């Protein structure tokens, strides 16, 4: 009798039919789509054979939009309606966008994510990104000849929850099923690791148009373990262009510039930067709207000089990522360069000097992320051949915690924890009869809630009334493979439950992430003192309240002198708790606890006698 083969649920394609899935690199400057054909990943070109799609969208008064090269060509004459580098705005509020006052766009002052005023109406970064994704989806379906079942879309490793959610929302608008959000450095490691059968510790240095990521990975026998991540999602090739634009303006004395002239000179600056990747000098020519002619010669040494601090700025997260991973530059077997901006000779030299080795450049830095994403998409779609499996172990960049009494933070998921991850911890009530609990979800490394970033708040209601400390509330944090967080709280006795999917209105800037981490190191001792003070104050308040309730019900068990002594101890605790010395508060609490031991014993005796009153020996036990 023939044996029937049974595949995992959702992993079995129809006989002789492949499930079409693609990898998409949604970049700041350019975007790409790739797929696996005949077991080989390849970038899918447009009808003109071009692999890259400029991440540019121009909106027209009739509501239509031009995407890609056509929009890029129109950017100079219509700068306000031509949206470039929209990835920098994803999941960001107005206050999070760097140099917003110098932007060419008309921003709308609205709550939540930043909005852009265009000829076709007000557009969000999610809508702009959806136009780019829809174009890539159509390109893939035309090239592959059928509809897609889904896509793996790459994001910077340092994208926070809001930025990741915005990316998923854009994909949904574009009609794409997201199989996975994959960190860009991890995608590059897949492409390199599987191509070269590499093992060991690798660093992925990813400098794109608008973002910078550094990841330290350990590759062993098909397992990709991310040991640490770092970066800055507001630093990229665009910043080198901006620095060069400022140099041009200073050389010619052109202030102020019209929007059209700014965009024209930015285009010339980018072209000059790219030219200097393969030559020692270049000429910048432009005719402004006033008729003024710009003619400058720029040599490589000058460009290196005016952008040197940007190059050095990338090395700060590199040092920290290595420190977090517990390794040094000498332990790194290879350095993978990702992103078009890594073509700059100054970048390659700085990376090579720091790690003491030539970085790996045998794969096109513009394409490597899309190729790795395509391989992961092919795996998730169930098209892989036996032996092509691999395991990704990614991490979260910042700790996740919950606020407890006294404004303290209890960390539930530490930073650099491997995802997906689920962690749970039990908490209890503070007061007798408490029937609700407020859950405050936080992100950061500090000890006090006021120093961390608030992600969400929700309430667990319906807790059965009990004495303080009797209820057991289990709080569970779940971070999925896309890095998105959900939190649930459950009272274990009654089963009452509440949950929230964390969707902040806008994201956490990576300057904030870096600042939060730096502050956590600098303020560690101060934070621990504050935490100890808050903990002792909470314990003091709890003991005073419990003693007060006990005196109300059983105060007649004490003589007048004993009652006066307890009252004095309580007053002493309350007074000392107003101070800043946590050791003094702890000592006062211990004195009150010891001073009420005899009272507690008498209460216990009374309780036992009351419980046994009127019962026969046979009825007990």
From Swiss-Prot:
GO biological process: iron-sulfur cluster assembly
UniProt-recorded name of the protein: Chaperone protein HscA homolog
Family to which this protein belongs: Belongs to the heat shock protein 70 family.
Function: Chaperone involved in the maturation of iron-sulfur cluster-containing proteins. Has a low intrinsic ATPase activity which is markedly stimulated by HscB.
Any coiled-coil regions, as ranges: none
UniProt KW keywords: ATP-binding, Chaperone, Nucleotide-binding
Record-linked CDD domains: ASKHA_NBD_HSP70_HscA
Species assigned in the record: Cupriavidus metallidurans (strain ATCC 43123 / DSM 2839 / NBRC 102507 / CH34)
Molecular-function annotations in GO: ATP binding; ATP hydrolysis activity; ATP-dependent protein folding chaperone; unfolded protein binding
Superkingdom per UniProt: Bacteria
PROSITE patterns the record matches: HSP70_1, HSP70_2, HSP70_3
Pfam assignment, any one: HSP70
Keyword Chloroplast attached: no
């Amino acid at each position: 009798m023939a044996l029937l083969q049974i595949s995992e649920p959702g992993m079995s394609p129809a006989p002789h039919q492949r499930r079409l899935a693609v990898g998409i690199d949604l970049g700041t400057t350019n975007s790409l789509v790739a797929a696996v054909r005949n077991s080989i990943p390849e970038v899918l070109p447009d009808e003109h054979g071009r692999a890259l799609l400029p991440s540019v969208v121009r909106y027209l008064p009739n509501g239509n939009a031009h995407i890609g090269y056509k929009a890029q060509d129109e950017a100079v004459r219509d700068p306000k309606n031509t949206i470039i580098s929209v990835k920098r705005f994803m999941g960001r509020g107005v206050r999070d966008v760097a140099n917003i006052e110098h932007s060419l766009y008309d921003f709308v002052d609205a709550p939540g994510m930043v909005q852009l005023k265009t000829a076709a109406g007000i557009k969000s970064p999610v809508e702009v990104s959806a136009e780019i994704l829809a174009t890539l989806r159509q390109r893939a379906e035309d090239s592959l000849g059928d509809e897609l079942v889904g896509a793996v879309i790459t994001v910077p490793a340092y994208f926070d929850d809001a930025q990741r959610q915005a990316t998923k929302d854009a994909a949904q608008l574009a009609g794409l099923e997201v199989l996975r959000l994959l960190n860009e450095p991890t995608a590059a490691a897949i492409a390199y690791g599987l191509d070269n059968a590499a093992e060991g510790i690798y660093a992925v240095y990813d400098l794109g148009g608008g973002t910078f990521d550094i990841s330290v990975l350990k590759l062993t026998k098909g397992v990709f373990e991310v040991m640490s991540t770092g970066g800055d999602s507001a630093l990229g090739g665009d910043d080198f262009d901006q620095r060069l634009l400022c140099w041009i303006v200073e050389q010619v004395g052109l202030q102020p510039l019209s929007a059209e002239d700014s965009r024209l000179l930015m285009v010339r600056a980018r072209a000059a930067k790219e030219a200097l990747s393969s030559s020692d000098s270049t000429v910048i020519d432009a005719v402004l709207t006033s008729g003024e002619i710009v003619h400058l010669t720029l040599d490589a040494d000058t460009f290196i000089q005016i952008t040197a601090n940007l190059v050095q700025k990338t090395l700060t997260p590199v040092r920290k990522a290595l420190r977090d991973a517990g390794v040094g530059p000498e332990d790194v077997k290879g350095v993978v360069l990702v992103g078009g901006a890594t073509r700059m000779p100054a970048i390659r030299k700085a990376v090579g000097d720091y790690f003491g080795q030539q970085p790996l450049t045998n794969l096109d830095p513009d394409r490597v992320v899309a190729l790795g994403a395509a391989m992961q998409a092919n795996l998730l779609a169930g098209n892989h051949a036996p032996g092509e499996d691999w395991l990704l172990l990614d991490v979260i960049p910042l700790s996740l915690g919950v606020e407890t009494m006294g404004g303290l933070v209890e960390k539930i998921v530490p930073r650099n924890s491997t995802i997906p991850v689920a962690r749970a911890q039990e908490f209890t009530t503070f007061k007798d009869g408490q029937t609700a609990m407020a859950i405050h979800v936080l992100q950061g490394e500090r000890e006090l809630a006021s120093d961390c970033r608030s992600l969400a708040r929700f309430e667990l209601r319906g807790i059965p009334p009990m004495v303080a400390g009797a209820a057991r509330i289990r709080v569970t944090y779940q971070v999925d493979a896309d890095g998105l967080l959900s939190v649930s709280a459950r009272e274990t006795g009654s089963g009452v439950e509440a949950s929230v999917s964390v969707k902040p209105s806008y994201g956490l800037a990576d300057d904030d992430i870096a600042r939060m981490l730096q502050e956590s190191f600098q303020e560690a001792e101060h934070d621990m003192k504050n935490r100890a003070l808050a903990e002792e104050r909470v314990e003091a308040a709890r003991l005073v309240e419990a003693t007060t309730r006990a005196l109300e019900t059983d105060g007649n068990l004490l003589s007048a002198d004993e009652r006066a002594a307890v009252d004095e101890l309580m007053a002493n605790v309350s007074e000392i708790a107003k101070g800043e010395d946590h050791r003094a508060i702890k000592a006062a609490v211990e004195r009150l606890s010891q001073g009420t031991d005899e009272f507690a014993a008498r209460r216990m005796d009374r309780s036992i006698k009351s419980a046994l009153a009127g019962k026969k020996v046979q009825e007990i036990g």
